[in-house]
C-alpha cells in the first residue's frame, strides 16, 4: 500500500495488510535479526542507477570475485566483485567501489552447475535461472569457490516455510515466476521513517492503492518468536485494529485475507515500498475462507492441492501473457475464466505499480481477437476494430465500473467512405510516470531481443517497444498511418492532395472524383508537403543504408566464425588422438558455436529490419513518383497561368534533384527518375492524344504510377522531366506538330535502337532541367491546327513524331534497364579511344548534338574500338611491308635469326665467297626499325691502323676465353675432312678478325650492320668452308648474330 511502513517497528505489533505474495524468513541461526526480504520490483535488471538499494545494516553472507557473462553482444565474461546480502546479489567493479553495477534478487531462483545443453565452455561455471527470464551465468576461479557460491546462492534463493507457519494460507511464490529485476519500472526510493512515526490511515491508503496499483503490499512470514505471542493484538502499525473497509465496487481485486496475528509488516531493506497484486503469480484472488471482520487471528489450513492449483493458475496467467506479447494464440478455449475479466488485468507484471494509473485507455488484444495486419489499410478506411467491442463486453461482464473508460469514436470528415471510424484515445488519460515507462520499455526491448532458446521469438513485424506502445495495440512498423485522429482539415482541405493520398493508398478508387475533375488546372502547390515528403524519403534512404551496412558487417562476422569453426573441426580430426588437445578444441568449438548463434540471431533481426525499411522506402518513393506525375499532368494542361507553370516546374526540378542525388549515392538500388522523367535529349517524346494514334493516353500510362486515367483526362507521361516545358510551350503554339500513328512494324523496330543512340549522344551533355537545342518539325503531312488544340503544351516537346517514342515508355515491361550516368560516360570514352584507322572504317557519328527530325534507318551496333595498347605490332609491320613501294620483301627479325641458326647448324650446304667475307659489309635498309642512312665513306689510313690495333688486342682475348668452349661442337665430323694445324690457325684468325671488326664498326657508327642478300635465297653470310672440327668454325656467325641482336 502507499503508506510507508516503519523502518524499525516493534516486533510486538500485528499487521492486517492483505497478503497475496510469497514470503521469506530469517535462517534459524540468526533469531535476533529482524527478517527482511528483497524488493520484488527492481527495475531494468537492477543495472546501475536502477539497481536495488543495499541495506547497510544487513550482514554480508558471502563476497568474492566471479566472472559474469555479459547480457549483450558476443557474451564476453566480465570480472566483477559480488556481494551476497539479504538474499540479493550485488556486483561492483572491484571491492573498493561503492557504486553498484547491478543487483540480482535471488529469491526462488534455481542455482546449479551448467549443463551441456547450456553451451558454456568455460570451466567452473554455474548458473542462476528462472523460467521465462534471462539466465545468469557465473564462473568461479576454482571448483571450491564454485561449490561455495552455489551453496550460498541456493540458500538465499530457497523459500523456507517453518512447520509452525504452514497452516497460514499464504500465497506461495511459484518457482516459474519472473522475479527478475530487469523487467520492472523504476520507483522512487522512499526513505524509511523512524519507528515512532505514524503512517497514513488505512482507508486513504486503500483508496490510493485503487488508483495506482500499489494496494496490496506483501507481508512476510516470520519465525515464531515468544515475545510476539505475548503481545496483545490491540494495534497494527500504530492504528487501532478494526475491520478493513470493503473493496470498492470498481476495484479489480476482491478483498483478500489479512496477515495472521504475530506477523509484522517489515520495512523494505532496499527502498522498494510498493507491491503489485497484478502480477500473474501474485494470486490477486485468494480464497476468502476466513472471518470477514475483526482481527484475523486464525484461518483454516490450506491443503496441498490448493497450493498446486495456485501455482498452476500463476503459471497459466504467465503463459497467457507471454503468448499475448508474442502473438501466439493461447491454448485455452473461449470458456476460460481469463476471458471474463478485462484485458488490462493481464497487463504485464513489470508495470504492476502503475497499471491502475492508466484506466484502460490502451488495451491489449484479448486472446483470439487480435485483428489482421493494418498496414494495408489507410487510416480513414478502417472500420471499428472487433477487439474494441470485445474489450467493452469483457469490462462490463466483469463489472469494471467507473474505473473503465470507454473509447471515443469519431466520424472523420472525409471524401472517401463516410462510414469509416477512427479510434481516438481518451482525453482524460493521465500522462504520468514517463520515466518509469521509459525504463519499462527499455527493459521490455532487451527482453524481446534476447529470447530464450526454447521459446518462440517475437514476430519481427511487431517492432520495438516505445513509450506510446506500452499500452496500445501492437502494430506493424510498416503501417503508414497510426491509429490517431486524422488531420481532416490538412488532408482533405485540398482536392489535389486528397487525390494523391487517396490514389496511393487505394488505387481501386478512381483518382479523379467528379467534383474535382474539371478543376484540376487550379491546383496550387503545397511546398511544405513536398518538402516533408522529400525529407522523409532522404531520411528513410539513410536508414536503409545504415541497416544495409550493419547487415554486411554481421554477414562478414558470421563468415569468419564459420571459417574458424571449420578449422576447429579439421583440427579435431587431425589431433583427436592426443590426450589433452581435443578438450581445448572442444571448448573452443563450443565458444565459437555460441557466438555464431548470437550473430545469426542479430543478422536475422537486422535483415528483417532492413526489409521493412526497404518496403517503407519504396512506398515513399512511389509516393514521390505519384506527386511528380501529378505535377507533370498539371504542367501539361492548356493553362495560361505563367506563374503557376513556373512554380510547378520548380517543384518538378526539386523532386528530380533529390531523386538523382539518391540514385548517385546508392547506385545499387533502382532509385532512378527514369520512370517519371523524360529520356535524356530528344528521345523524351510523348504520343499524341489524337484519335488517329492507336497508343492513346490511357494505354501509355506507366504501370508504376498509381493512377489509372479516366476518359477525358490528358495523357499521363511516364517520363516528364529534363525538358523545360515553358520554352516548349511558346514554340509549340507556333509550330503544328505531326502526329504519325505507329502502324507499321518498321516504325516500332526503330524505337529501341534510336533510343540507345540518342541517349548515348546526350548522356554527358544534358543535365536535369537543361533543354537541348530544338529543330523545326517536318513539314510534310502537316496537320491542321484544330487537330492539336489540346496538344499545344503537352504534346511533342522536341518536335519529334510519336514514332520516335522510347521503347521503355511504350512498352514498359520490355524495356531494358537504363544505363547510369557513369556507365554512359565510360562508354563514350571507350568509343572515343582507338586508332584513327579503325575509326575511319567504323560508322561516323554526327558531331552536332542537334537531332535530325526526319526518320533515319536504324544504326548498326558499333564494334568497340581497340586502344593503342591492344593493337598487335605484327599487323602494323605486315601493313607497312605490304605498302612499301617496289615490292621488296624484307625479313623479319625472327626469320633472320632462324636463318642464321640454320646456317650455323649446316654450314657445308652453302658456297661462301671468302673475299666477300673479308670485305667491308654492305649497308642495308631496315625500314621497320626507322634507321636513317648515312653516306658510305671509306676509312682513312689512320683509322685503318687504329682499327687493326684494336683487332689484334681483342683477337688474343677472344682466342684465350672462347677456344675451349667451341672445341666440342663438331668432334664427330673431324674424321671425314682432315686438315693440317696451320690452315686451322689461319682460319681461326680470320674468324676473330671479322667478328671484332663487326663489333667495333657497330659501336663506332651507332647503327646496325647486316649482310645484304645477293639472291632470293639466304644471303651470303660469314660461314666457314672448313669442317666443324675447326674449333672456331662457328665463331663468325655467332659474332654477326650477336652484333645484330645487340642493336635491336
Swiss-Prot record:
* Compositional bias of kind Low complexity: 687-711
Q: In which tissues is it expressed?
A: Highly expressed in heart, kidney and throughout the brain.
Q: Which Pfam families match?
A: PH
Keyword Phosphoprotein in record? yes
Residue spans with biased composition (Basic residues)?
A: 828-842
Feature: compositional bias, Basic and acidic residues: 201-233, 815-827
Domain PH intervals: 59-158
Protein name according to UniProt? Pleckstrin homology domain-containing family A member 6
Task: Spell out which residues are annotated as carrying Phosphothreonine.
Answer: 744, 784, 920, 1015, 1020
Q: Which SUPFAM superfamilies match?
A: PH domain-like (SSF50729)
The record's section on SMART domains has: PH
Record keywords, A-Z: Phosphoprotein
Residue positions of the PTM Phosphoserine?
Answer: 247, 251, 314, 459, 461, 472, 591, 777, 801, 848, 854, 867, 940, 1017, 1021, 1024
**Taxonomic superkingdom:** Eukaryota
Regions of compositional bias (Pro residues) in chain numbering = 1016-1030
| Cell wall biogenesis/degradation found in the keyword field | no
Q: Which InterPro entries match?
A: PH-like_dom_sf, PH_domain, PKHA4-7_PH
Q: Which residues carry this modification: Phosphotyrosine?
A: 492
Spell out the residue ranges making up region: Disordered.
Answer: 1-36, 165-318, 448-467, 663-746, 793-858, 968-989, 1005-1048
Amino acid at each position: 500500500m502507499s503508506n510507508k511502513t516503519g523502518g524499525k517497528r516493534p516486533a510486538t505489533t500485528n499487521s492486517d495488510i492483505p497478503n497475496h505474495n510469497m514470503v521469506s524468513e530469517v535462517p534459524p541461526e540468526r533469531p535476533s535479526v529482524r527478517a527482511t526480504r528483497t524488493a520484488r520490483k527492481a527495475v531494468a535488471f537492477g543495472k546501475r542507477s536502477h539497481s536495488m538499494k543495499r541495506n547497510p545494516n544487513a550482514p554480508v553472507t558471502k563476497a568474492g570475485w566471479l566472472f559474469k557473462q555479459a547480457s549483450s553482444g558476443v557474451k564476453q565474461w566480465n570480472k566483477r566483485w559480488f556481494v551476497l546480502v539479504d538474499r540479493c546479489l550485488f556486483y561492483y567493479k572491484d571491492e573498493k567501489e561503492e557504486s553498484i553495477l547491478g543487483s540480482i534478487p535471488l529469491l526462488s531462483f534455481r542455482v546449479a552447475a551448467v549443463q551441456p545443453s547450456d553451451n558454456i565452455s568455460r570451466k567452473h561455471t554455474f548458473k542462476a535461472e528462472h523460467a521465462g527470464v534471462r539466465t545468469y551465468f557465473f564462473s568461479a576461479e576454482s571448483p571450491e569457490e564454485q561449490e561455495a557460491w552455489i551453496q550460498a546462492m541456493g540458500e538465499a534463493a530457497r523459500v523456507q516455510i517453518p512447520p509452525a507457519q504452514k497452516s497460514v494460507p499464504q500465497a506461495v511464490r511459484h518457482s516459474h515466476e519472473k522475479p527478475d529485476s530487469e523487467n520492472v519500472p523504476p520507483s522512487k526510493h522512499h526513505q524509511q521513517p523512524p519507528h515512532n512515526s505514524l503512517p497514513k490511515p488505512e482507508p486513504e491508503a486503500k483508496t490510493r492503492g485503487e488508483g495506482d496499483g500499489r494496494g496490496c503490499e506483501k507481508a512476510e512470514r516470520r519465525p515464531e518468536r515468544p515475545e510476539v505471542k505475548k503481545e496483545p493484538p490491540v494495534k497494527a502499525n500504530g492504528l487501532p485494529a478494526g475491520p478493513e473497509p470493503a473493496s470498492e465496487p470498481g476495484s479489480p481485486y476482491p478483498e483478500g485475507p489479512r496477515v495472521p496475528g504475530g506477523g509484522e509488516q517489515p520495512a523494505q531493506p532496499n527502498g522498494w515500498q510498493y507491491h503489485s497484486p497484478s502480477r500473474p503469480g501474485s494470486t490477486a484472488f485468494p480464497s476468502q475462507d476466513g472471518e470477514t471482520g475483526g482481527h484475523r487471528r486464525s484461518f483454516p489450513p490450506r491443503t496441498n492441492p490448493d497450493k498446486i492449483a495456485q501455482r498452476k493458475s500463476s503459471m497459466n496467467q504467465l503463459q497467457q501473457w507471454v503468448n499475448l506479447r508474442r502473438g501466439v494464440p493461447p491454448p485455452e478455449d473461449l470458456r476460460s475464466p481469463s476471458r471474463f475479466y478485462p484485458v488490462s488485468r493481464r497487463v504485464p507484471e513489470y508495470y504492476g505499480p502503475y497499471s491502475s494509473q492508466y484506466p484502460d485507455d490502451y488495451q491489449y488484444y484479448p486472446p483470439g481477437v487480435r485483428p489482421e495486419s493494418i498496414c494495408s489499410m489507410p487510416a480513414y478506411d478502417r472500420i471499428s476494430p472487433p477487439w474494441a467491442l470485445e474489450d467493452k463486453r469483457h469490462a462490463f461482464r466483469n463489472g469494471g465500473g467507473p474505473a473503465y473508460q470507454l473509447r471515443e469514436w469519431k466520424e472523420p470528415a472525409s471524401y472517401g467512405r463516410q462510414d469509416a471510424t477512427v479510434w481516438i484515445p481518451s482525453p482524460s488519460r493521465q500522462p504520468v510516470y514517463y520515466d518509469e515507462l521509459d525504463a519499462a520499455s527499455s527493459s521490455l526491448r532487451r527482453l524481446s531481443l534476447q529470447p530464450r532458446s526454447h521459446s518462440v521469438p517475437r514476430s519481427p513485424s511487431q517492432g520495438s517497444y516505445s513509450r506510446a506502445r506500452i499500452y496500445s495495440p501492437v502494430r506493424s512498423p510498416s503501417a503508414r498511418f497510426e491509429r490517431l485522429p486524422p488531420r481532416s482539415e490538412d488532408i482533405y482541405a485540398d482536392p489535389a492532395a486528397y487525390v494523391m493520398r487517396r490514389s496511393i493508398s487505394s488505387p481501386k478508387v478512381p483518382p479523379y472524383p467528379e467534383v474535382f475533375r474539371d478543376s484540376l488546372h487550379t491546383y496550387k502547390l503545397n511546398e511544405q508537403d513536398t518538402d516533408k515528403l522529400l525529407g522523409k524519403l532522404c531520411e528513410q534512404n539513410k536508414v536503409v543504408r545504415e541497416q544495409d551496412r550493419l547487415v554486411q558487417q554481421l554477414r562478414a562476422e558470421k563468415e569468419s566464425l564459420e571459417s574458424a569453426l571449420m578449422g576447429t573441426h579439421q583440427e579435431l580430426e587431425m589431433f583427436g588422438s592426443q590426450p589433452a588437445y581435443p578438450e581445448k578444441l572442444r571448448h573452443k568449438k563450443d565458444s565459437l558455436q555460441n557466438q555464431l548463434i548470437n550473430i545469426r540471431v542479430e543478422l536475422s533481426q537486422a535483415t528483417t529490419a532492413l526489409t521493412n525499411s526497404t518496403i517503407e522506402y519504396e512506398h515513399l518513393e512511389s509516393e514521390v513518383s505519384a506527386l511528380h506525375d501529378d505535377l507533370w499532368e498539371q504542367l501539361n494542361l492548356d493553362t495560361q497561368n505563367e506563374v503557376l507553370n513556373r512554380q510547378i516546374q520548380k517543384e518538378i526540378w526539386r523532386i528530380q534533384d533529390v531523386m538523382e542525388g539518391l540514385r548517385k549515392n546508392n547506385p545499387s538500388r533502382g532509385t532512378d527518375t527514369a520512370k517519371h522523367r523524360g529520356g535524356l535529349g530528344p528521345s523524351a517524346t510523348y504520343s499524341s492524344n489524337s484519335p488517329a494514334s492507336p497508343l492513346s493516353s490511357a494505354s501509355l500510362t506507366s504501370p508504376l504510377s498509381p493512377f489509372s486515367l479516366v476518359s477525358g483526362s490528358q495523357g499521363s507521361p511516364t517520363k516528364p522531366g529534363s525538358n523545360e516545358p515553358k520554352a516548349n510551350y511558346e514554340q509549340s503554339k507556333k509550330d503544328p506538330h505531326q502526329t504519325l500513328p505507329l502502324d507499321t512494324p518498321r516504325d516500332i523496330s526503330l524505337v529501341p535502337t534510336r533510343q540507345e543512340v540518342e541517349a548515348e549522344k546526350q548522356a554527358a551533355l544534358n543535365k536535369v532541367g537543361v533543354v537541348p537545342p530544338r529543330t523545326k518539325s517536318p513539314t510534310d503531312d502537316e496537320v491542321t491546327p484544330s487537330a492539336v488544340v489540346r496538344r499545344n503544351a503537352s504534346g511533342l516537346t522536341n518536335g519529334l513524331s510519336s514514332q520516335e517514342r522510347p521503347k521503355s515508355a511504350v512498352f514498359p515491361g520490355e524495356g531494358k534497364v537504363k544505363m547510369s550516368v557513369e556507365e554512359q560516360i565510360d562508354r563514350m570514352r571507350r568509343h572515343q579511344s582507338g586508332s584513327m584507322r579503325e575509326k575511319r572504317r567504323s560508322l561516323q557519328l554526327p558531331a552536332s548534338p542537334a537531332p535530325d527530325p526526319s526518320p533515319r534507318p536504324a544504326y548498326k551496333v558499333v564494334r568497340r574500338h581497340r586502344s593503342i595498347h591492344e593493337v598487335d605490332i605484327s599487323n602494323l609491320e605486315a601493313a607497312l611491308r605490304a605498302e612499301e613501294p617496289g615490292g621488296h620483301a624484307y625479313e623479319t627479325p625472327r626469320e633472320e635469326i632462324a636463318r642464321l641458326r640454320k646456317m650455323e647448324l649446316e654450314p657445308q650446304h652453302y658456297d661462301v665467297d671468302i673475299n666477300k667475307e673479308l670485305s667491308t659489309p654492305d649497308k642495308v635498309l631496315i625500314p621497320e626499325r626507322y634507321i636513317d642512312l648515312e653516306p658510305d665513306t671509306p676509312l682513312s689510313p689512320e683509322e685503318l691502323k687504329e682499327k687493326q690495333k684494336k683487332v689484334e688486342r681483342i683477337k688474343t682475348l677472344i682466342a684465350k676465353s672462347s677456344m675451349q668452349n667451341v672445341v666440342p661442337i663438331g668432334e664427330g665430323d673431324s674424321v671425314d675432312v682432315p686438315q693440317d694445324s696451320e690452315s686451322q690457325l689461319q682460319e681461326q684468325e680470320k674468324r676473330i678478325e671479322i667478328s671484332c671488326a663487326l663489333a667495333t664498326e657497330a659501336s663506332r657508327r651507332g647503327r646496325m650492320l647486316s649482310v645484304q642478300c645477293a639472291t632470293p635465297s639466304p644471303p651470303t653470310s660469314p660461314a666457314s668452308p672448313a669442317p666443324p672440327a675447326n674449333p672456331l668454325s662457328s665463331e663468325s656467325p655467332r659474332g654477326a648474330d650477336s652484333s645484330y641482336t645487340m642493336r635491336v
